[in-house]
């Protein structure tokens, strides 16, 4: 609901669809934002067509667990990596994806997932947040990244620098993107004692306004937004919406006072 509630004025007329695994949270969001369509189900069960959305925004779950989805099982993705892969498939070519994830996505030793993403999307920019960013909202102290990607129109086999890790001038090993763009790290690197011994983390700058730092970092990210190209031979407007899992296949339903027919 936070993403919907903070939508800029220029996007107020957008058609918004959400997926929320917690039924209570989904119900609250649906009541607060009644013009949206919120599916109360796990993301892996969401029946959403490919190349459907202009933008995908979310806060992906973290954890060392895997999701059972036959389409993606061969990749052996951890849950946060799975969210990136499926979200990219649901995004139209040229569409923008902005996801909050743990620093593990960018900093893990294996480059496999980053290469998978790079083949399908261009990294427009990444912002590393200090470890207290979500402490007040979620009660967690974890270094998080905002990754902003633009989907490619075709698969490309390449490995940009951000697929790999590098070491900064202080000997801290991290994603090469943040070594090359230290201004996108909104805090100071410190070595602290963690659950598994010493670990590198990002602590907030003293007396710094995270909102101002974030706005400045975002101003460094640029993209050319392309309009979706509609086939001129199509004679009817595509008014399809993601299928409601509670509506039986090949049956009619009413959404926002309009009649729809569910087909797959």
Which residues are covered by each model-predicted region?
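Short glycine-rich, flexible loops that bind phosphorylated cofactors or substrates
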Residues: 64-65, 106, 156
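Short glycine-enriched, charge-decorated loop/helix-capping segments at active-site entrances
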Residues: 70-75
